[in-house]
Design a protein with these regions (language model features):
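Hydrophobic anchor at the beta1->P-loop junction of P-loop NTPases
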Residues: 13
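ATP-dependent NMP and nucleoside kinases share a basic, alpha-helical "lid"
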Residues: 103-111, 115-152
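Walker A/P-loop
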Residues: 22
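ATP-dependent small-molecule kinase phosphotransfer cores
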Residues: 43-115
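ATP-binding Walker
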Residues: 19
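P-loop (Walker A) phosphate-binding loop of NTP-binding proteins
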Residues: 16, 28
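Small-molecule kinase domains that catalyze NTP-dependent phosphoryl transfer to phosphate-bearing small molecules
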Residues: 98, 102, 131-132, 152, ...
Length: 223
């Protein structure tokens, strides 16, 4: 009989701010996918990983810790916010801990035998988390729509919202790096239909990214 454990498929989920990533995520959850939230893990690491906190205190002085030894986020933010080099240092220190925690969580969920695990990471590619993913779905939308959505959602001024949009990658960035790009310029119903279509393509084993890489490698070999 089927004593083979069904394969786990890790789905990377990323995209532009305000494009509708969370709606796509909810749709995947309803299909029974397990969930790994990279931002939540990053938060958790900074709060609970004692060795990481010690590393941070060594770099940015003891001022960044509260009396009880927990992280004072406000203090840390004040230090790194206006200083690119310090922000880079912060990321360098905390990064290995986050990656380890994500790896551990993926391993735990694999062992539980989940068919789908969604790795939700706004900076999926920058962080190198794409290497844990069997397939990657990116959610994109027209700039004006994203602007309206984050204005309505995050209580930002128009300037702040504009700045946040400008800091985002263009659609082409995601197209080059993803298996499936979902455009969300329409209703939620349309979006859910697109998710259903993508999921059935994933089910049947479509892996556009791998195919592209294989084709590129072949072309390299020819030259």
């Amino acid at each position: 009989g089927r004593n083979m454990k069904q394969n786990t498929v890790v789905i990377g989920l990323t995209g532009q701010t305000g494009a509708g990533k969370s709606t796509v995520g909810e749709s995947l959850l309803r299909r029974g996918a397990a969930w790994v939230d990279a931002d939540l893990i990053a938060h958790d690491v900074a709060d609970n990983e004692k060795v990481c906190l010690a590393d941070l205190a060594l770099e940015f002085t003891i001022d960044i810790l509260n009396v009880d030894g927990t992280l004072n986020r406000k203090k840390l933010a004040d230090i790194v916010f206006h200083d690119k080099a310090k922000l880079r240092r912060l990321n360098e220190i905390i990064f290995p801990y986050i990656i380890r925690a994500i790896e551990a969580e993926l391993a735990r969920l694999r062992a539980e035998g989940h068919h789908y695990i969604v790795l939700d990471a706004p900076t999926l590619f920058e962080s190198g988390c794409d290497r844990y993913c069997d397939v990657i779905i990116s959610v994109v939308a027209d700039e004006q729509l994203r602007l309206q959505r984050i204005l309505g959602r995050d209580g930002l001024t128009h300037e702040e919202a504009e700045a946040r949009i400008q800091a985002q990658h263009r659609e082409s960035y995601y197209v080059r790096r993803s298996d499936f790009v979902i455009e969300n310029n329409d209703t939620v119903d349309t979006l859910c239909l697109k998710v259903a279509e993508v999921m059935s393509r994933i089910e049947t084993g479509e892996r556009p990214r791998q195919q592209r890489q294989a084709e590129e490698a072949q072309q390299e070999a020819r030259h």
